[in-house]
Amino acid sequence: MTLHRFKKIALLSVLGIAAISMNVQAAERIAFIPKLVGVGFFTSGGNGAQQAGKELGVDVTYDGPTEPSVSGQVQLINNFVNQGYNAIIVSAVSPDGLCPALKRAMQRGVRVLTWDSDTKPECRSYYINQGTPAQLGGMLVDMAARQVNKDKAKVAFFYSSPTVTEQNQWVKEAKAKIAKEHPGWEIVTTQFGYNDATKSLQTAEGILKAYSDLDAIIAPDANALPAAAQAAENLKNDKVAIVGFSTPNVMRPYVERGTVKEFGLWDVVQQGKISVYVADALLKKGSMKTGDKLDIQGVGQVEVSPNSVQGYDYEADGNGIVLLPERVIFNKENIGKYDF
């Protein structure tokens, strides 16, 4: 073998090894994006995502904007794409605002999924969904109904914003259920805290002051629910039923003091974990279809459902929804079993 031929073979070997290393690295890099950082709900989801990364041997990066904005999420998405990440999983602040950036990412071969809050279905492959709008909207009304024991009542809705996808879907279903099953309930106001703890507390206090005879506040938002509970304590209002969605660690003191009798959520740590497992399966298998099942360590089996379970008309190959196995009602009896 000539020296020239030896050098050529050696160079090709080095380039081949480098290419393999780059492909392995790219396939192992998954970005997990919340609406914003610094909120316990999203931190818990990120913890689940990173736990899954360790189990699967993939590199999961958790990062989000400091405020819930389309521009902040788009900047992160573009950065992750430019850095060569192979999959992006995002809790969208807007159903359509992220679509141009996500479609560009998909055109470059990046796997795009959503969790917690969806985009339009054509802007992602799979949505890791905590529950259908009917399930979660119904859950909100049922929690309120267990405490509002009268035919005529005044109810307020209070959550993050008028544009966030999932909460508006839940509230739409909840209002429809109220109209059908509790026609004597009057929805006196719908207000927003915009994912800001201070503004949420001010808004909640404003609701309770403006409607002194309010029977229930329905707050399906991780900031709005504790704000409503704190507002009731600040104003010494022990007559209003406060229900909604938040994490057990945040709500524990309000439940223990009796300010909140029960509230709901799902295991957001599991949601983060499932999201990464689905992304990893896509990277390894190439695609999944409706009816496909996936076994997840410590969770069990999940299944790909059509977009129609979320009320969407859009269906396509390699596109669908993965529902969490269950949702949870927290109360004084069981809240001690949970830590997230």
Swiss-Prot record:
Phylogenetic placement of the source organism: Bacteria, Pseudomonadati, Pseudomonadota, Gammaproteobacteria, Enterobacterales
Signal sequence annotation: 1-26
Pfam families: Peripla_BP_4
NCBIfam families the record matches: PRK15408.1
Family: Belongs to the bacterial solute-binding protein 2 family.
Domain of life: Bacteria
Presence of the UniProt keyword Nuclease in the record: no
GO cellular component: ATP-binding cassette (ABC) transporter complex; outer membrane-bounded periplasmic space
Assembly, per entry: The complex is composed of two ATP-binding proteins (LsrA), two transmembrane proteins (LsrC and LsrD) and a solute-binding protein (LsrB).
Identification of the protein by name: Autoinducer 2-binding protein LsrB
Biological process, per Gene Ontology: transmembrane transport
Main location: periplasm
Alphabetical keyword list: Periplasm, Signal
UniProt-annotated location(s): Periplasm
PANTHER family in UniProt: ABC TRANSPORTER PERIPLASMIC-BINDING PROTEIN YPHF, D-XYLOSE-BINDING PERIPLASMIC PROTEIN
One annotated GO molecular function: carbohydrate binding
Role noted for this protein: Part of the ABC transporter complex LsrABCD involved in autoinducer 2 (AI-2) import. Binds AI-2 and delivers it to the LsrC and LsrD permeases.
